[in-house]
């Protein structure tokens, strides 16, 4: 039966476990219409454009 040759330290154990806790970095792009930061593949919150077209009318909010 396989047995570990040495005791695994708490630091080494925690470093191994921590790799699964890492969150992916959020990608932020700029809106080509107004230049404000936005998430990719989503409508711009500032101007309401998506894929070069006006999708949402934001004039009521302002």
From Swiss-Prot:
It comes from Finegoldia magna (strain ATCC 29328 / DSM 20472 / WAL 2508). The lineage of its organism: Bacteria, Bacillati, Bacillota, Tissierellia, Tissierellales. Residues 1-20 are annotated as: Disordered. Belongs to the bacterial ribosomal protein bL32 family. Transmembrane segments: none annotated. Keywords: Ribonucleoprotein, Ribosomal protein. PANTHER family: 50S RIBOSOMAL PROTEIN L32 (PTHR35534), LARGE RIBOSOMAL SUBUNIT PROTEIN BL32 (PTHR35534:SF1). This is Large ribosomal subunit protein bL32. GO terms for cellular component: large ribosomal subunit. It holds the Pfam family Ribosomal_L32p. GO terms for biological process: translation. Residues 1-19 have a biased composition (Basic residues). One of its GO terms (molecular function) is structural constituent of ribosome.
């Amino acid at each position: 039966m396989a047995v570990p040759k040495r005791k695994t330290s708490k630091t080494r154990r925690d470093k191994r476990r921590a790799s699964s806790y890492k969150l992916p970095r959020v990608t932020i792009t700029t809106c080509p219409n107004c230049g404000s930061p936005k998430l990719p593949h989503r409508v711009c919150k500032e101007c309401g454009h998506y894929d070069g077209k006006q999708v949402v009318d934001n004039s009521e909010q302002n």
